[in-house]
Amino acid sequence: MKKRSPIVAGYFYPDKPGELRSVIEWSFKHGIGPGKPPSPSDIPATNSIGYVAPHAGYIYSGPVAAHVYFDMALNKKPDTIVILGTNHTGLGRPVSVYPEGVWETPLGDLVVDSEIGRLIVENSEIAEFDEYAHLEEHSIEVQLPFIVYIYGEDVKITPIVIGIHTPDIARDLAKSIYEASMSTGKRIIVIASSDFNHYEPHEETSRKDSMAIDRILKLDTDGLYNVILHNDISICGPGGIMTLMEYTKKLGGKAQLLKYATSGDTSGDYSHVVGYAALKFYI
């Protein structure tokens, strides 16, 4: 079986299992995080269908990401997690679906759901099978250790890298994910992996991000696209976020902000920050 090895283990997060578990638990316990790791005694959450999660180094964005995985752990385990990454490298096709195989992490391996991937490609006008876009891309990989931490290896993934970020492509991809879910009856959670505004002072980044988050919470896909464009908001994964918004609308769902912070809140340097948001989509 084809294996995709980690490319940012040892950089964005530790490459040794014990150290990685410790950093994930630090993220849960951090003051910016939920305060503790999830446990069976916690009250079950609403029926989640997706999340927006950041993908920076864990020392910066881990506590915000932990809000996503704390909430996810309180929901019924999905059969498959569709992870929408963003194309930082320029490699591969415009919308690249990883076809089959295993993604390795220091905590365990996750099998690709080739059935869901095939149905997404068949039902989409733009999505294609392509491994090339995934080879050097970190935005999906950074989510996987958190997934293995809460679920072990007993969940499948469908990795998709998005290189063109428009509402029309988001609608096409959302439709294909929805049809794949309906035709298989599988419980799917969609994770849109994205950081928010980049490399401006904390106050300006927070101001810009609040405009984008307002559109996201209203599930206003065209509004999000326009506010990003007209206000120069450097969100790196808007295509995945818009896809999740459109998918949520197909299911009659809503959006909720779990946590917002910037890298300044974890690093102490507020002069040039990156914004991080944990958002939940549910029915």
UniProtKB/Swiss-Prot annotation:
InterPro entries: MEMO1_fam. It holds the Pfam family Memo. Belongs to the MEMO1 family. This is MEMO1 family protein DKAM_1357.
